[in-house]
């Protein structure tokens, strides 16, 4: 469950290390974002010479949450940290590599590029 002011790790090589959620997109008063949802983020920590800079505002898709996601068979997939992948204006990933596992639910959300770049799909 990601909400405004939540700080997330970045799971790609866009140059950002930590981002903070400033808005959950989809609905007028939507409060929480789960895996596969798009959020607006601001970069709080970035590496030198990266594609994004500290203070930049971008869209991101949530790929891992501590809350997890429930499957139809009753299984729950949870992670140790919250993480997101930075997106450009066309909702395509900014980075060219994805770090860490992602869930199969991203396949349904039209993020096949992220699923194909990920080293592990749960």
UniProtKB/Swiss-Prot annotation:
GO cellular component, one term: cytosolic large ribosomal subunit
Protein biosynthesis keyword on record: no
Keyword Transmembrane on entry: no
Molecular function per GO: large ribosomal subunit rRNA binding; structural constituent of ribosome
Record-level GO BP terms: translation
Pfam families named in the record: Ribosomal_L14
Protein keywords: Ribonucleoprotein, Ribosomal protein, RNA-binding, rRNA-binding
Role summary: Binds to 23S rRNA. Forms part of two intersubunit bridges in the 70S ribosome.
Family statement: Belongs to the universal ribosomal protein uL14 family.
Record's protein name: Large ribosomal subunit protein uL14
Organism: Psychromonas ingrahamii (strain DSM 17664 / CCUG 51855 / 37)
Upper taxonomic lineage: Bacteria, Pseudomonadati, Pseudomonadota, Gammaproteobacteria, Alteromonadales
Protein encoded by which gene: rplN
């Amino acid at each position: 469950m990601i909400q405004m002011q939540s700080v997330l790790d970045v799971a790609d090589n866009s140059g950002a290390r930590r981002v903070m959620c400033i808005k959950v997109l989809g609905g007028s008063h939507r409060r929480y974002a789960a895996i596969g949802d798009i959020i607006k983020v601001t970069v709080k920590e970035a590496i030198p010479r990266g594609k994004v800079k500290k203070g930049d505002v971008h869209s991101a898709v949530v790929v891992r949450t501590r809350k997890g996601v429930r499957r139809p068979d009753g299984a729950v997939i949870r992670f140790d940290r919250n993480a997101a992948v930075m997106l450009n204006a066309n909702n395509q990933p900014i980075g060219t590599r994805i770090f860490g596992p992602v869930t199969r639910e991203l396949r349904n959300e039209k993020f096949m590029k992220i699923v194909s770049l990920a080293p592990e799909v749960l």
